[in-house]
Amino acid sequence: MQYYAAPMEGLTDRVWRQAQQKWFGPEGTAHRYYAPFLSPPENRVLIKKKMAELAPAANPGAPVIPQLLAKDGELAAWMIGELRALGYTEVNLNLGCPSGTVTAKGKGSGMLRDPAVLDAFLDAVFSHAEGPISVKTRLGVSSPDEFAAILDIYDRYPICELTIHPRVMRQLYRGQADRAAFAEALPRCTMPVCYNGDVTTPEELHALETQFPQLSGIMIGRGFIADPALLRRARDGTGASREELRGYLDDLYHGYTELFGSAGCAVSRMKAHWFYLIHRFAGSEKLEKQLRKAREPWEYEVLVNQIFTLPML
């Protein structure tokens, strides 16, 4: 069974990918790391700063898979060609993002509203692009019952792997992932299938492997940010030590400071990571509130020192 790191905007960037592999590899390393989505520019002029995220030299270690968020199939195919020129083989199409700002433009899971539009998009992509193309999807817009028609469209194209997040667009990330609906859909899929959604512990990971042994992979998102040693725990039972977690977080902080050219901007990015990580420390509620309000680097650094005096859970 392959384990993948999910693309999460503002979290699973190259700074995180490097720090996670450094501190928790090789046993804690994912087989693949899916990069947060890129939107191909309509003028077909690439922005150097955005493309730096996918520069091969900035992504040593396990394979990285770029993800595209688009609604123009020919434009997406052009971008796939640009990514191939950088040395990437597989490219992933994001048909699952439920964010309102994305779906309002007919992108992400907004593409699932109209099967004809979805079909035309995929036809344009696969007619003009070469090489392996995977897809990340949801079950539908408002009901899992929509997935049968969506899958009929996916079956028309040589999708190398289909990652299914078993929620619908309107759920966002509320409620539970619908594993019953996933179990119903899986036997109907003709392409390799990866599961994604609510995998936060080694026990949940192993339960999925047992329930769905035919999966090609399991993709982990928020659970990986909350516990960067999750895969190591799943493989050999070794959790993150206090020293490892501190080194990992310090590398993130310094990496973001260098990337943004500002420790203040790094603090904002670190608070996104701490949103998931803070619950690893017992009695952290008061410090969590203070951390949310922190603006200055010195405030952040003092609070992190205080957090690391607490017992780890």
What are these regions (language model features)?
Residues 1-313:
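Flavin-dependent oxidoreductase catalytic cores
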